[in-house]
Amino acid sequence: MPTFTKEEIVHLGDLARIALTDEEITRLQGDLNVIAESINKVQEVATDDVEPTANPVPLEAYLRPDVPETPLTQAEATAGAPVSEAGMFVAPRILGQE
């Protein structure tokens, strides 16, 4: 069973640029040891007859039928716009004056 030492936890904190208190080091040491133990249990499972998979549930993408439709006219597209001019949307200037 792998166990993380306090020195390893401090080193991980240094790598992540995180200052850890003694209390946090102790808590993280326990948490990481539990995680490592759980990983070891999963690795012990007999998987010789199980094929590798990325997802245990088969995924199928639902795509709507690609049916051509009549597009909006320019007038219909700009009809709901707060401001339009000459068939184009008008938006407030977001960049400074040039």
Swiss-Prot record:
The gene is gatC. It catalyses: L-glutamyl-tRNA(Gln) + L-glutamine + ATP + H2O = L-glutaminyl-tRNA(Gln) + L-glutamate + ADP + phosphate + H(+); L-aspartyl-tRNA(Asn) + L-glutamine + ATP + H2O = L-asparaginyl-tRNA(Asn) + L-glutamate + ADP + phosphate + 2 H(+). HAMAP family: GatC (MF_00122). InterPro entries: Asp/Glu-ADT_sf_sub_c, GatC. Heterotrimer of A, B and C subunits. SUPFAM superfamilies: Glu-tRNAGln amidotransferase C subunit. Its EC number is 6.3.5.-. One of its GO terms (biological process) is regulation of translational fidelity. PANTHER family: GLUTAMYL-TRNA(GLN) AMIDOTRANSFERASE SUBUNIT C, MITOCHONDRIAL. This is Aspartyl/glutamyl-tRNA(Asn/Gln) amidotransferase subunit C. Keywords: ATP-binding, Ligase, Nucleotide-binding, Protein biosynthesis. Belongs to the GatC family. Allows the formation of correctly charged Asn-tRNA(Asn) or Gln-tRNA(Gln) through the transamidation of misacylated Asp-tRNA(Asn) or Glu-tRNA(Gln) in organisms which lack either or both of asparaginyl-tRNA or glutaminyl-tRNA synthetases. The reaction takes place in the presence of glutamine and ATP through an activated phospho-Asp-tRNA(Asn) or phospho-Glu-tRNA(Gln).
